[in-house]
């Protein structure tokens, strides 16, 4: 039986991607196979990421793209700079909303607490950016955003990087208010003196 894994891939809004051989059109649920029988992250294969945040290194705006859970199979080759993987075969499984994307990014951090953080993750405190999300990790993390932004907040144990508590929620203007700092329990926390 062929080995299969799940990963993440971003596409243009029309489900196209630019490959070494040009633009490729995808459809959900269809298996695609690379002509080369050996995947090589530097020159061929279908490129995906194990950390959904790494997709934003290639498609910088979540609003101008689509992020999907994909199933990969066949020969695979891991990249050296982030969680990028090149696979011989790929199939689009599920499109992610922004909240699902951030939740899965938080799950990846929880599963790999000792890996270096993606540049979209901020230590201790984070403010939602142009991609409408913020992820903060630390012993006393906090985050804030505007209405519609998604916050992921992960508290580590004091003596190691393991995650002790985590939350992910949308600033909805009712339960969670805009421009208010929240902790990993989803509770309001005070701003730093210089922020008041």
Predicted regions and their residues:
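Short, glycine-biased loop/turn motifs at secondary-structure junctions and
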Residues: 1-196
């Amino acid at each position: 039986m062929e080995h299969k894994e799940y990963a993440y891939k971003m596409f243009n809004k029309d489900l196209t991607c630019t490959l070494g051989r040009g633009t490729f059109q995808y459809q959900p649920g269809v298996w695609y196979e690379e002509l080369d029988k050996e995947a090589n992250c530097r020159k061929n294969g279908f490129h995906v990421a194990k950390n959904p945040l790494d997709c934003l290194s290639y498609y910088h705006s979540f609003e101008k793209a689509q992020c999907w859970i994909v199933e990969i199979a066949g020969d695979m080759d891991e990249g050296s700079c982030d969680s990028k993987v090149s696979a011989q075969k790929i199939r689009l499984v599920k499109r992610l909303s922004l909240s699902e994307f951030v939740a899965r990014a938080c799950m990846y951090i929880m599963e790999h607490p000792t890996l270096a953080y993606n540049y979209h993750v901020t230590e201790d405190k984070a403010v939602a950016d142009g991609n409408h999300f913020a992820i903060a990790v630390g012993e006393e993390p906090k985050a804030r955003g505007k209405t519609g932004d998604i916050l992921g907040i992960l508290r580590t144990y004091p003596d190691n990087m393991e995650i002790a508590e985590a939350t992910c929620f949308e600033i909805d203007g009712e339960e969670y208010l805009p421009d208010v700092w929240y902790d990993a329990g989803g509770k309001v926390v005070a701003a730093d003196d210089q922020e008041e």
